[in-house]
Design a protein with these regions (language model features):
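Conserved N-terminal entry element of GNAT/NAT acetyltransferase domains
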Residues: 1-17, 156-162
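A short beta-loop-alpha structural element at the N-terminal edge
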Residues: 7-21, 30-32, 143
């Protein structure tokens, strides 16, 4: 595995199935704890959402595929409303988690935010302490405590929070 080969490329319509599956694979352990969880229904909803995203039907949304050594291994979705960069989703296939890929992907988002002098926001589930530790290590701080999630923010380099 060579992290120097890591690429983030725009998702193509034919990759909607991959996008849905990588989200499911990355989140399956947490989702399956819910006794009412229906994997087939969840996957169908993820697929429909991915199809809308890659077709450009979600305003201000950019969905990308994370590629390492020529293999698709994850998904990154950002929303660009103009006053911030919101990471709406980052999923890395479980066999690639814990190898610094998420840090590198988020690092590229942070670099773009620094160039544009914009803050970066994201949400993390309270049931996902590993992701929260990663975000805190990168400098994100909890900006708002929500029922089952927390909104985290990394301020712009100029210090403004816009």
């Amino acid at each position: 595995m060579n992290l120097d080969s890591l690429r983030i490329k725009p998702a193509e319509p034919e990759e909607a199935e991959f996008l849905a599956n990588v989200i499911l694979d990355a989140d399956r352990d947490r989702l399956s704890e819910d006794p009412d969880w229906d994997e087939a229904a969840w996957l169908a909803n993820l697929r429909a959402a991915a199809e809308r995203e890659v077709a450009g039907k979600v305003e201000h949304s950019i969905t990308s595929v994370i590629v390492l050594d020529g293999e698709r291994i994850g998904r990154l979705r950002v929303i660009l409303p103009g006053d911030e960069i919101h990471v709406a989703g980052i999923q890395i296939h479980p066999s690639y988690q814990g190898k610094g890929i998420g840090s590198k992907v988020l690092g590229s988002v942070i670099e773009e935010a620094e160039t544009a002098d914009l803050p970066v926001t994201l949400e993390v589930g309270k049931d996902n302490p590993d992701a929260k530790r990663l975000y805190e290590r990168l400098g994100f701080q909890v900006a708002q405590d929500r029922k089952v999630r927390e909104l985290m923010r990394l301020s712009c380099p100029s210090g403004s929070t816009r």
